[in-house]
Amino acid sequence: MRTYAERARAIQPTGVRKMFDLAGEDTISFGLGEPDFQPPPVAIEAFHQAMLDGRNKYTTTAGLPALREAIAKGWDAYAPGLTEDNVCITMSGTNALMNLFLTLLDPGRKVLLPEPYFPLYGPDATLVGGSATYYPCRFEHEFVPQIEDLEALVDEDTVAILYNFPSNPTGGTINAAQRDALLEFARKHDLWIISDEVYDRIIFEGEHVSLS
């Protein structure tokens, strides 16, 4: 009997998923980063009006130009000069990450990923034929990776590094000096930088420091 591809069989359920399966029906879940509020009324109305106007057809490959332009403007504080040509709309953050790994990782090539980490980072790298190497983000360093740990893990097969600030799941953030050190490490080893900043607006002290 034929079986699934090796890359599919290599993907195992995460610890988070196992805990969900063990939970009873009356359990209060703290396991998902899901807001307890609805989208703003202006957004709901805009989606509603778009459906009434028949705007539910195929768009350009990169996404609606007006949406891409708005996103570029929203990032102007972090990366001045962005235009809609620098933005590509995807179905989700995970879909965007898969696209990046498909673009950057040849079979056998490695990406450095943070640990603790969002559960789909590693499986996404595996599914495209790449390999994940995990660098530690320790409590005693406020979950910010240390350059000496990164230096011990990088090798000639490593082509990219993923940074995640604010971090999921630790909540760790970085300051400007730490950002500059992490950028310099990547430049030194000629690594692609993948920056997951999906929680950039959930900051309780200070301001978000972007790697853009």
Name each model feature, range by range.
Residues 24-27, 129, 157-158, 190:
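Residue-level detector of structured alpha->beta connecting loops
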Residues 7-92, 99:
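N-terminal small-domain helix-loop-helix segment of the aminotransferase-like
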Residues 55-184, 201-212:
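Conserved core of the PLP fold type I
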Residues 1-7:
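Generic N-terminal amphipathic, Lys/Arg-enriched alpha-helix
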